Amino acid sequence: MEEEKMAENKIKTIGVLTSGGDAPGMNAAIRAVVRRGLSNGLNVKGILKGYNGLLNEEIIDMSAKDVSDTIERGGTILYTARCAEFRTEEGQKRGAEICRKHGIDGLVVIGGDGSFAGAQKLANLGINTIGLPGTIDLDIACTEYTIGFDTAVNTAMEAIDKVRDTSTSHERCSIIEVMGRGAGYIALWCGIANGAEDVLVPEKYDYDEQKLINNIIESRKKGKKHHIIINAEGIGHSEAMAKRIEAATGIETRATILGHMQRGGSPTCKDRVYASMMGALAVDLLIAGKTCRVVGYRHGEFVDFDINEALAMQKGISDYQWEVCQSLSHNYDNCLLYTSPSPRDLSTS
């Protein structure tokens, strides 16, 4: 009797979708889900354009050939979108009904916290779901790694190196704005990797513009030919900041906003391998009868967490990481450890 029940509940068809912002390595994860599923005798369906495509029934059969020569490509072959309708109870119920209509027993959702919230709703409606952390921001608390972060931070690092070259040639001050609306990990890592003089992140927002101006002036007095400031998107207003700094110091100051280039490009080895491992584990979890789980990476191991727990966790830059970043800057004796207005106040000229 128990064997009959297990046979009835056995996963036969799985789906995979990418949701929210794209991230390098998503294709590696998709490839792993498809091939791991097929190797276990499952049917695999790709859902185009995230939850939006699910509600529009843009669902295709996936073969091993469909994911050939994709591991090295940036973006997502399944496309992605944000879907306001899926935030409603009606949209969520319809999504679950469409999964059943197409025989999808389990669903792998690749995205960030918002995507996981959608997966959680589907799980509550009886659809087995597993989430994979796909975001360049590294802002998911249950994991030390997110798909796309490694590529994005390397893209930003290489771009900042190039800005430094021209900044030195012209003896400029340069503000480079990197992605990270609510999380400053790209800014923090680039601050250390690029040897920036100053780093501004939303988690450790202790910005004092006069102190920053003083740092630039003191740096110039000491013979420094450039001054690199890395500014997270969550603080923003780099153009306005550059104008004020130039007016106050007399030093030519330029703002460079890296923008969406950080989302693109061929994924690094780490993003390809880690995304592949996560994709394979997601399929294994579905086969094992698990649902409402998020795959993560902690302490050298690929692990899984309950989605509810994962969404409840809080993540932030540690005081130690921030202190190291500050102490290694060329202005370590003038660290920006002061309080000032909120990030939005920087928009004033």
Where are these regions (language model features)?
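N-terminal phosphate-binding or glycine-rich loops at protein starts, especially the Walker A/P-loop
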Residues: N9-L55
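Short Gly/Thr/Asp-enriched flexible loops that form oxyanion-binding sites at enzyme active sites
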Residues: A29-V33, G114-I127, A187
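Glycine-rich oxoanion-binding loops at beta->alpha junctions
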Residues: L55-L107, I147-N154, E158
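Short, acidic/small-residue loops that bind anionic groups at enzyme active sites
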Residues: A123-T146, L200-K204, I257
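C-terminal non-catalytic interaction/assembly regions of soluble proteins
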Residues: H237, I245-S340
